[in-house]
Amino acid sequence: MDMQADEMYRQDPLGSCGNPRQVSHITGRLSSLLGELPATWIEGEVTQLSPRRIGVFLTLKDMNESKHLEFFLPFDAFKDEVEVGNRVKIHGKLEFWATSGQIKVKGFEIQSVGIGELIERIARLRVQLALEGLYEHKRPLPFIPKLIGLVTGQNSDAEKDVVTNVLLRWPAAKFCTIYASMQGASCVSETISAIQKLDANNDVDVIIVARGGGSFHDLIGFSDEQMIRAVFAIKTPLISAIGHEADRPILDEVADLRASTPTDAAKRVVPDIADEKRLIKSAMSFLKKSYEPVIDKIKCDTLSWSQAFSNPFETFIAPRRREIDLFYQQMLTVVWANFSKTETEIAAIKKHLLAISPQNTLVRGYAMIEDETGRIISSADKLSAGDTVTLRLHDGLVRAEITQ
């Protein structure tokens, strides 16, 4: 930036419609501002590596974000061999490249992040997530999944192992497969996206993330904090089948089930149809042995009742004829006893009635005198000469007239 332009910028730093800044002024100012910043160490994953005649251009990406930054380093800045996918630290300074209009980092030194350092970071993250309780919540797997979600590399051995072994065990199984990078710069973002898409599918009731092992650097994405928290947040149970026994990724811890290999995942996600058939056959045999005697007895009883109801008289009445006759005799005895007792009581009452009956007195020669109205005359004072009376004898009536 020349002295005149610099003075103009100081007097009117924002510019105006009447006095706009030239592109060269802005780029020069930007370059000047960046030049004032100190050099710093920057860490990331190498996603692009382009050696040129003057040096090496490369791009670093964060593990947890999709942000990236471009670097330029001279050849003598490299002490170790660096490849795409490696995690590195670069000591450099921000610069504005006016010709391309980009901000890049001019690197002075590049170092590979050692495995020991990465292991230590992962160990700290593993403990932190454990303290937060991310490993405690385990979702149950369905006994027979309706639809298995599979996240794996396209045309990978892991995909073949899972699909082949699942179909061998349960031929009716169905898959919904989403391919993702199983290592490298895109591993975390693509795997998270695939898991979330499958979780949003209501037909998918279990998810398998499968990869056939690999080096520590290959599997580092499966210990990424963003991926672990994404898996914890889904509602669908998930099986981790990364297949690395020595250095298990943190995904194994947060998953609802850890499988040692993709083949092991296939054995865990569906039952073996041959085993289930044997169990059903065994159960049917047990039921047959347990209930066959009961069924035979029911058949026998049913036949007996059927025969009995075909001739109910011979079955129910004839065998009880003697009981009926005996009951009849007992009833007659009771009836006659009651009749005799009643007859005796009636005779006694009759005798008593006869003893006090006026008719019995008449038999002995007495007569009752009744006036013309039928009233009994019990005193001579009630009669007068000329009255007509009726004499009631034991065997009839006699009319008489009172003369005196």
From Swiss-Prot:
InterPro entries: Exonuc_VII_L, Exonuc_VII_lsu_C, OB-fold_nuc-bd_dom. The keyword Cytoplasm applies. It catalyses: Exonucleolytic cleavage in either 5'- to 3'- or 3'- to 5'-direction to yield nucleoside 5'-phosphates. It comes from the Bacteria. Keywords: Cytoplasm, Exonuclease, Hydrolase, Nuclease. GO terms for biological process: DNA catabolic process. Its main location: cytoplasm. It is found in: Cytoplasm. Its EC number is 3.1.11.6. GO terms for cellular component: cytoplasm; exodeoxyribonuclease VII complex. GO terms for molecular function: exodeoxyribonuclease VII activity; nucleic acid binding. Coiled coil: none annotated. Bidirectionally degrades single-stranded DNA into large acid-insoluble oligonucleotides, which are then degraded further into small acid-soluble oligonucleotides. Heterooligomer composed of large and small subunits. HAMAP family: Exonuc_7_L. Belongs to the XseA family. This is Exodeoxyribonuclease 7 large subunit. It comes from Tropheryma whipplei (strain Twist). The gene is xseA.
